[in-house]
Amino acid sequence: MNITIVAPYCSLPSEPHFNRFWYLAELLSQSHDVLLITSNFKHYDKSFRRPEDAEAASQGRLKVMLLEESGYSKNVSLGRVTSHHRFVKHFEQWLENCRPGEQDVVFSAYPLIATNLLLGKHKARLGYKLIVDVQDVWPESFSSVVPFLKKVPHNLLPFASRANQAYRYADALVAVSQTYLDRAKEANPNVPGEVVYIGADFPKLDAAPAKDFGD
């Protein structure tokens, strides 16, 4: 089976942060051909990856592809909007060049909203099943930056209709919490859904040396 994972915020093995998308990519590549698509920009430290980083992370049946974005210095900024737009444009170009049958399943992180909308629009042409993994609820989470949005019903928020359409394109839904899954299922109630909480790598925890913090 050919599986594509779309995860703009994914960390690679040489980087300090662990996440489910790399874990899933490694696990699936044991028996499937896996393409992991992520950004050349590292959200956590605001630096850029090099093409060699993708080459080093690719192994066996797992291939890593970096899409270019312009980067940003602040998480809440016009620069981030511009950077995401650039990533989405490159993703759209890649998707338009794909041929039917190249992917059997696409597992896509949400957000971004736009990448999931594109995947939904191309799904029938390319013939894959789309699984959307809800990591955060946009636009609802914008209320942490603009508090008055908490008073607005979520379906009246800016971009709510785009969010609902992204959820509706999914053939199955995964989310990091029951609350997030419920939100996605509100828009797309008739597909399978599963909560998979953010976890930890227990072997690494067990191998870590104990530290005495005193009294």
Q: PLM ranges: what are they?
A:
Residues 1-59, 172:
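N-terminal subdomain of nucleotide-sugar transferases
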Residues 10-13, 100, 114, 128-150, ...:
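A short, histidine- and acid-enriched strand-loop-helix "catalytic/donor-clamping" loop
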Residues 14, 80-96, 105-126, 132-141:
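An aromatic- and histidine-rich active-site surface loop
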Residues 36-98, 196:
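A conserved catalytic-core segment of Leloir-type glycosyltransferases
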Residues 40, 179, 199:
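Carbohydrate-associated surface elements
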Residues 114, 118, 182-186, 204:
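Phosphate- and divalent-cation-binding pockets in alpha/beta enzyme and binding domains
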Residues 114-117, 121-125, 138-140, 153-173:
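Membrane-proximal helix-turn-helix segments that form the acceptor-binding/catalytic region
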Residues 200-215:
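Acidic anion/phosphate-binding donor-loop and adjacent secondary structure
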